[in-house]
Regions:
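Acidic donor-binding segment of Leloir-type glycosyltransferases
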Residues: 26-69
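Conserved nucleotide-sugar donor-binding
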Residues: 153-167
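Short beta-strand-to-loop acidic/aromatic patch adjacent to the donor-nucleotide binding site
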Residues: 92-103
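Active-site nucleotide-sugar/metal-binding loop of Leloir-type enzymes
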Residues: 82-94
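A short, glycine-/small-residue-rich helix N-cap motif at loop->alpha-helix starts
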Residues: 73-80
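N-proximal low-complexity "stem/linker" segments adjacent to membrane-targeting elements
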Residues: 1-27, 35
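Conserved donor NDP-sugar-binding/catalytic core segment of glycosyltransferases
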Residues: 107-143
Length: 167
């Protein structure tokens, strides 16, 4: 069964990206794509922080199937994130997306993979979302729930290339 790629969308927060990478290390996803937006003009600290963020990608050392999309100039979240998702969906049928400040619970990748496979052929479902407001030290609690909603939210998102968002 083909692995579903992980897409990490990052910018200028290397410490947050490192935390996400370390949380991914527990499940070691075999296919990882990372998109890093460029520094903003007129923000003196951005070039250094963006450079450190790009360097942090090297911590993904559990797989050789890592590719990066590096923007030299800043596109902003409203353009960089959709460009990153399109970049991955040009190669794969679906993707699990994380922003750089996400920290995953141990079951999320399995949940997302199962959800993508189960709902992949339903045109009325555009994405599956994971969000947990439980404090970080409680994430090891084995009690996990899922619910369906018509309103998308933040957190980890699992996207399908063939879904019709207007359905």
């Amino acid at each position: 069964m083909e692995s579903i790629p992980i897409l990490i969308i990052a910018f200028n927060r290397p410490d947050r990206l490192i935390n996400l990478i370390e949380s991914l290390r527990a499940t070691k996803p075999p296919v990882v794509r990372v998109a890093v937006d460029g520094p903003r003009v007129g923000r003196p600290g951005d070039p250094r922080r963006v450079s450190e963020t790009r360097a942090a990608v090297q911590r993904i050392d559990w797989t050789s199937d890592v590719a990066t999309l590096i923007h030299d100039t800043n596109l902003g979240c409203e353009r960089a994130a959709p460009a990153a998702v399109s970049w991955v969906l040009n190669e794969f049928e679906s993707v699990i997306v994380f922003e750089d400040d996400a920290v995953l619970g141990p079951q999320f990748i399995e949940f997302a993979t199962r959800a993508l496979r189960e709902f992949n052929y339903r045109n009325d479902i555009f994405h599956v979302n994971g969000y947990n407001v439980v404090p970080h030290d409680m994430l090891t609690n084995p009690a996990a729930t899922a619910r369906l909603s018509r309103v998308p939210g933040g957190g980890g998102a699992c996207l399908f290339s063939g879904a019709d968002p207007g359905a």
